[in-house]
Amino acid sequence: MQSWSRVYCSLAKRGHFNRISHGLQGLSAVPLRTYADQLIDADVTVIGSGPGGYVAAIKAAQLGFKTVCVEKNETLGGTCLNVGCIPSKALLNNSHYYHMAHGKDFASRGIEMSEVRLNLDKMMEQKSTAVKALTGGIAHLFKQNKVIHVNGYGKITGKNQVTATKVDGGTQVVDTKNILIATGSEVTPFPGITIDEDTIVSSTGALSLKKVPEKMVVIGAGVIGVELGSVWQRLGADVTAVEFLGHVGGIGIDMEISKNFQRILQKQGFKFKLNTKVTGATKKSDGKIDVSIEAASGGKAEVITCDVLLVCIGRRPFTKNLGLEELGIELDPRGRIPVNTRFQTKIPNIYAIGDVVAGPMLAHKAEDEGIICVEGMAGGAVHIDYNCVPSVIYTHPEVAWVGKSEEQLKEEGIEYKVGKFPFAANSRAKTNADTDGMVKILGQKSTDRVLGAHILGPGAGEMVNEAALALEYGASCEDIARVCHAHPTLSEAFREANLAASFGKSINF
């Protein structure tokens, strides 16, 4: 990827883009007009500034393309930076510290406090400070890389034109060689339940509650549900998650890991009702909410009363008023934009990436697609191995995985072997008094090649990147087992699990 950057930056400086046979059609550099003009000419126009959009815009500019990024919100960064990944991680981290201090954890380490008090306003302030710094950072990167930022609601008004409607009703027209749709996703509504972001909230409202609820019900025990539910459970709420499926952690999680994960969360005080569906919710005169539930297969109805109801049943692609219908670009049955392997829609110069196309709705997946997509516009190779895209649940302990689960391997009829290592036998986890969880490695029986890695425990979100690298390069379990890992570190558990998978036995367990 770096070599492509050097080649195209060099060509851009020498004005040779029009000689690239696979590049943008008619890509001679065109001077960009200022904001005061009615029209902007560009080579690439990105609609959306979330992880996929802003990264794609910067990469396009670095490749020498005249780039515009249209964003409907006042701040850059999309859902992830403003009301998703970033603020939730701030609350997850700080609520974990509070939980340690308020419970017996600190005392067991010899740290004694006479009084531990939660200042929720201060916690929210720290979250907002982090968000502001990062969104401002994107604005700085745009300026540094000469990406033109247009604040307005972007609509494709022609195969070579985007019109941004601003808050004041004014419009900015961009004539562009290529268009990249990176508009992300929005919260999936629950039929019959109206979200007011006050007491019936989506993930957005759950990040900004004014006080800790006495009782909270979470609809959905997937990634977002367990993350946000655990935040408020740690801060003192009585939290119950109602999940239609028979496990926690969402789609893709290994079932053995999921069961252990659920057990640990329950030990912390998080409650679950699995194989259960929500049939409705009613606000009472005292402000509380009655949530009606019953077994997923049907059965006796039950009512749970709560102060706050959090709806976390997933997200759906955001393609509203993009102008796709007028262009003849149809959506698939799940509302996604169909694209080919180069991320092109049925109109070759209109591309789409991230949550609006097929695949997991992950920020890092969108970032990778954004980079690869614009490199493809410039004539570069386009390839992503989606089997090597990791997933992380940022609770404590964390859960992370990449590659195949045991259930997937069984379904596909692939013969495999398993290597496991518990954090209870890891010296660093022991010294940290943080020993819940394990590392589980799945290797191909005939070749020893790593097929999947599943981690439940401290630092899982960092450790999984070593596993992703191993899968990307087709490493064997023995390859990893023979790599010297620093001692004492948590990642030694990853090596030990690969020892167990390759040789049938780990050293320290």
Swiss-Prot record:
It is an enzyme of class 1 (oxidoreductase). The record marks D448, Y473 as: Important for interaction with PDHX and activity of pyruvate dehydrogenase complex. Its EC number is 1.8.1.4. Residues 1-35 form a transit peptide. Pfam families: Pyr_redox_2, Pyr_redox_dim. Its cofactor is FAD. The modification Phosphoserine is found at S285, S297, S502. GO terms for molecular function: dihydrolipoyl dehydrogenase (NADH) activity; flavin adenine dinucleotide binding. SUPFAM superfamilies: FAD/NAD(P)-binding domain (SSF51905), FAD/NAD-linked reductases, dimerisation (C-terminal) domain (SSF55424). NAD(+) binds at G220, A221, G222, V223, I224, G225, V226, E227, E243, V278, G314. Tyrosine phosphorylated. The modification N6-acetyllysine is found at K66, K104, K122, K132, K143, K346, K410, K417, K420, K505. Homodimer. Part of the multimeric pyruvate dehydrogenase complex that contains multiple copies of pyruvate dehydrogenase (subunits PDHA (PDHA1 or PDHA2) and PDHB, E1), dihydrolipoamide acetyltransferase (DLAT, E2) and lipoamide dehydrogenase (DLD, E3). These subunits are bound to an inner core composed of about 48 DLAT and 12 PDHX molecules (by non covalent bonds). The 2-oxoglutarate dehydrogenase complex is composed of OGDH (2-oxoglutarate dehydrogenase; E1), DLST (dihydrolipoamide succinyltransferase; E2), DLD (dihydrolipoamide dehydrogenase; E3) and the assembly factor KGD4. Lipoamide dehydrogenase is a component of the glycine cleavage system as well as an E3 component of three alpha-ketoacid dehydrogenase complexes (pyruvate-, alpha-ketoglutarate-, and branched-chain amino acid-dehydrogenase complex). The 2-oxoglutarate dehydrogenase complex is mainly active in the mitochondrion. A fraction of the 2-oxoglutarate dehydrogenase complex also localizes in the nucleus and is required for lysine succinylation of histones: associates with KAT2A on chromatin and provides succinyl-CoA to histone succinyltransferase KAT2A. The active site is a redox-active disulfide bond. NCBIfam families: lipoamide_DH. This is Dihydrolipoyl dehydrogenase, mitochondrial.
